[in-house]
Amino acid sequence: MKTALILGGTQFFGKRLVHKLLEDGVIVTVATRGRTRDDFGDGVERLVIDREKKESMTRAFEGRQWDTVYDQSCFSPLEAKTAYEALEGKIGHYIFTSTMAVYEFGKERKETDFDPLLFDPTFKHRKEYGGMTGYQEAKRGAEAYLFQNAKVPVAVVRPALVIGTDDYTERFLFHVDKVKKEEPIGAKNDDVSFSFTSSEDAAGFLFHAGKERLTGAYNIAFEDNFSLRELIGRIESAADKPAVITGEVTKENASPYGLPGDWTLDVTKAQMTGYSFGNMNEYVESLIEKLL
């Protein structure tokens, strides 16, 4: 991989991916709306595109070639379709960042638990996919379009809940702040288990997928997982303060991790490619200390 196009990539683990590519000597082009400032300096070429308008991508990519495209900003099968059509004949490998939300709730979900070759996508604009169910349908449909139609090798990465100091969603920070301020955390069931991955591993495996020219779907997560109750317990210990957990969930106190069921991933397939994930306990403890 000598050249790479990143669709998105100016936020969260997308930024880490760009830096890893640059450190490896890859010539990087970043295509975004041009609204978010980045710290890449003169190290990358920048293109301005609108993911929801195929003609803007067709113009931007005209006459260009890249070894690999990393699609970090696709939120509907329509966007997967228009991006691929604008890039057809211009790339050698398509890597799409999907989500563990393609799976139904359950423990140790394997890649085979959702088969995009059997899914029939509906082509709608991203705003037409509402809520968690809509998000799941949109990402499933995007995967389905690429695997069913792309004439180049496709890799799809399905990250667990991504955490890190660079998480602009502040979902993890929400819990740290609530414990620190002794404010209530709303959750109807704090015993369900879920998987995390670090922003370092999310970027690291994406880089690995391009370097090794992987194909197919891969889960990304720490090997271990824990419940919301266990997570809050770790924050309590580090902050030396008791948490206030309530089943009376409001808009203000609702935990972003207040899931209705278990949601954990099996990462055996990813590990078999030679990638080693970080240690969950060490990472979470370190992250809590940094956020307190």
Which residues does each predicted region cover?
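Conserved Rossmann-fold NAD(P)-dependent oxidoreductase catalytic core, especially the SDR/UDP-sugar
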Residues: T82-A138, A155
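NAD(P)H-binding glycine-rich loop region in Rossmannoid oxidoreductase-like domains
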Residues: R35-F40, E45-K90, F96, V102-Y103
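N-terminal Rossmann NAD(P)H-binding glycine-rich loop of SDR-like oxidoreductase domains
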Residues: A4-D24
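Alpha-helical substrate-binding/gating segment
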Residues: V176-G186, D191-N225
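C-terminal amphipathic/interface module of NAD(P)-dependent oxidoreductases
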Residues: P260-L292
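Glycine-rich Rossmann NAD(P)(H)-binding loop
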Residues: L7, G164, A187-V192, Y218-F226, ...
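Conserved beta-loop-beta element that borders a ligand/cofactor-binding pocket
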Residues: E143-D166
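Mid/C-terminal beta-alpha module of Rossmann-like enzyme folds, strongest
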Residues: F205, A209-P260
